[in-house]
């Protein structure tokens, strides 16, 4: 801005100087002293001032003010989200389906014999299981006959009866008993021992009923048979169903358990 003003002033001064130089010179008239009038010479400086007063400076055009930067338009405001959509139309309640048509009685009739067939199958299975158990018990009794003989031998030795086997036969029966006990599965050992105990008790009871007074006393040293521990006390009452042990049968049961452990 300042430089522009200085340049303007210099231009004005230059124009004034050129105008001053170009002042017209008065034409010389013939020298006639009578006609000549004294002319007052105006100093150059006054002329310049006079000219300067006559010609006023042209009004300086104002410097065009810089146009202000156009105000930036504010960023477009984000339009708010559209209003939430209308809620989904509520689902119409399901219409209860019509129940399926009930089966006709023709289909319900064959169901009854099916249940009867199931009952029959269950009964057959139970019968088969009972038969298998009976067969197993018979096999176990046959296998454990040596054990029964061993127990009877111990009973005869303790009570001094005449039916005493030789030591070699006794040992052989004892070995067979142990072998058979080891061959029997653990789940069936208990039942097998029960069967042997009941067989021994029945055997002794039958003998006592048939020959109550025909027992002959025969004593033999007990040291020859160290395994002959305990005593056999047969009961006069008939045993109950097989598979249960009565209190009076516990000693015999313990004897066979000891044999199985050995």
Swiss-Prot record:
Residue segments, region Disordered: 51-73, 87-120, 225-251
Listed Polar residues bias regions: 232-251
Top-level taxonomic group: Eukaryota
Biased composition (Pro residues): 56-71, 93-104
Signal peptide segment: 1-20
Pfam families linked to this entry: Gliadin
Post-translational modification: Substrate of transglutaminase.
Single Gene Ontology MF annotation: nutrient reservoir activity
Keyword Repeat: yes
InterPro entries: Bifun_inhib/LTP/seed_sf, Bifunc_inhib/LTP/seed_store, Glia_glutenin
Compositional bias of kind Low complexity: 105-120
Keywords, ordered alphabetically: Allergen, Repeat, Seed storage protein, Signal, Storage protein
Record Gene3D superfamilies: Plant lipid-transfer and hydrophobic proteins
Further comment: The alpha/beta-gliadins can be divided into 5 homology classes. Sequence divergence between the classes is due to single base substitutions and to duplications or deletions within or near direct repeats. There are more than a 100 copies of the gene for alpha/beta-gliadin per haploid genome.
Record function comment: Gliadin is the major seed storage protein in wheat.
Family stated for the protein in its record: Belongs to the gliadin/glutenin family.
Designated name of the protein: Alpha/beta-gliadin A-I
């Amino acid at each position: 801005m300042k430089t522009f003003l200085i340049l303007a002033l210099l231009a004005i001064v230059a124009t004034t100087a050129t105008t001053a130089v170009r002042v017209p010179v008065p034409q010389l008239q013939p020298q006639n002293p009578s006609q000549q009038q004294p002319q007052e010479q105006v100093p150059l400086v006054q002329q310049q001032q006079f000219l300067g007063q006559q010609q006023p400076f042209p009004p300086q055009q104002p410097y065009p003010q810089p146009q202000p930067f156009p105000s930036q338009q504010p960023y477009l405001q984000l339009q708010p989200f559209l209003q939430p959509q209308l809620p989904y139309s509520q689902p119409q309640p399901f219409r209860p389906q019509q129940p399926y048509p009930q089966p006709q009685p023709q289909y319900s009739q064959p169901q009854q014999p099916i249940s009867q067939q199931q009952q029959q199958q269950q009964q057959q299975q139970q019968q088969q299981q009972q038969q298998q158990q009976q067969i197993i018990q018979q096999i176990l009794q046959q296998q454990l006959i040596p054990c029964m003989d061993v127990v009877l031998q111990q009973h005869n030795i303790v009570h001094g009866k005449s039916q005493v086997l030789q030591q070699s036969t006794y040992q052989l029966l004892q070995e067979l008993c142990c072998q058979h006990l080891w061959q029997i599965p653990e789940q069936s050992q208990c039942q097998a021992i029960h069967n042997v105990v009941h067989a021994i008790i029945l055997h002794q009871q039958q003998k006592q009923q048939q020959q109550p007074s025909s027992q002959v006393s025969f004593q033999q040293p007990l040291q020859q048979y160290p395994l002959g521990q305990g005593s056999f006390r047969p009961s006069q009452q008939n045993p109950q169903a097989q598979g249960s042990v009565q209190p009076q049968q516990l000693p015999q049961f313990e004897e066979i358990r000891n044999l199985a452990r050995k």
